[in-house]
Amino acid sequence: MANPLYQKHIISINDLSRAELELVLETAAKLKANPQPELLKHKVIASCFFEASTRTRLSFETSMHRLGAAVVGFSDSSNTSLGKKGETLADTISVISTYVDAIVMRHPQEGAARLATEFSGGVPVLNAGDGANQHPTQTLLDLFTIQETQGRLENLTIAMVGDLKYGRTVHSLAQALAKFNGNRFCFIAPDALAMPQYILDMLDEKGIPWSLHSAIEDVVQEVDILYMTRVQKERLDPSEYANVKAQFVLRAADLQGARANMKVLHPLPRIDEITTDVDKTPHAWYFQQAGNGIFARQALLALVLNRDLAL
């Protein structure tokens, strides 16, 4: 069967069908069980981070190296022609695309990754996060982690907590889990950081149940996944940040009565929203989740850059 992801841009999680999501997750599981250090031996991949990143950049670049690819790029756009000389993003991508086989890109501006696809000359662009919009590869590692810990992606109750307005990870994850049957969502956020209406409308259109709550304790005993997010200081004015940052904090005591297999996930970095005593509980799974980023991103790179992938 032909690989449907070969040479495909991955900008939004909505660029992937349910079958394609399942293909990525199946490939990730195979690569986790059976590493392929020469799979991308003759490929060159650009890692272009116009915005600060630790986990996503290092995870992507580690994935590239562990598949044998050569990696070029930057982690600080202020030292590029775009930052120092005023070159446009369009021209930057037009040039980079002549050097490489794929472009992994993070940018603070919503829509920048989609714009890049118009100037990449057919070289696939993988979105590593564009502003508060989309973060599809984080969603892939989230799905991989949920499937590993719960044994399924259907018939789950998922609580999302914290910054649901600017937290691009929860937007992408809600859209992805909406492709699977029987899921239910609980949203716990201050009014100023509520889940965007377009996500709620999407769930309504698909007939997927969701509910709003004011406290973690309201739902902790009924959920399979508790997905925490930090309040993003860089996307709020100081007064708004001070008002909401401590409103939703998870402590170990809050997990009493939780289902035995319930897992607490977090895209990281964690600030104050999960206390360190949670780390010692069997529910804490955010560090394993981060580690799964290697395999999810390896899978995506392998599929995008190999016409016929046989593992």
From Swiss-Prot:
PROSITE patterns: CARBAMOYLTRANSFERASE
GO CC annotation, single: cytosol
Keyword Aminoacyl-tRNA synthetase: no
Biological processes annotated in GO: 'de novo' pyrimidine nucleobase biosynthetic process; 'de novo' UMP biosynthetic process; amino acid metabolic process
Residues reported to bind L-aspartate: K85, R168, R230
Pfam families in the cross-refs: OTCace, OTCace_N
Top EC group: transferase
Entry keywords, A to Z: Pyrimidine biosynthesis, Transferase
Residue sites binding carbamoyl phosphate per the record: R55, T56, R106, H135, Q138, L268, P269
Coiled coil location: none
EC number assigned by the record: 2.1.3.2
InterPro entries in alphabetical order: Asp/Orn_carbamoyltranf_P-bd (IPR006132), Asp/Orn_carbamoylTrfase (IPR006130), Asp/Orn_carbamoylTrfase_sf (IPR036901), Asp_carbamoyltransf (IPR002082), Asp_carbamoyltransf_Asp/Orn-bd (IPR006131)
Pathway(s) the chain acts in: Pyrimidine metabolism; UMP biosynthesis via de novo pathway; (S)-dihydroorotate from bicarbonate: step 2/3
Transmembrane parts of this sequence: none
Chemical reaction(s) catalysed: carbamoyl phosphate + L-aspartate = N-carbamoyl-L-aspartate + phosphate + H(+)
Superkingdom to which the source organism belongs: Bacteria
One Gene Ontology molecular-function label: aspartate carbamoyltransferase activity
Assembly and interaction partners: Heterododecamer (2C3:3R2) of six catalytic PyrB chains organized as two trimers (C3), and six regulatory PyrI chains organized as three dimers (R2).
Function as written in the Swiss-Prot or TrEMBL entry: Catalyzes the condensation of carbamoyl phosphate and aspartate to form carbamoyl aspartate and inorganic phosphate, the committed step in the de novo pyrimidine nucleotide biosynthesis pathway.
Family of this protein: Belongs to the aspartate/ornithine carbamoyltransferase superfamily. ATCase family.
Protein name per the record: Aspartate carbamoyltransferase catalytic subunit
Organism (species): Cronobacter sakazakii (strain ATCC BAA-894)
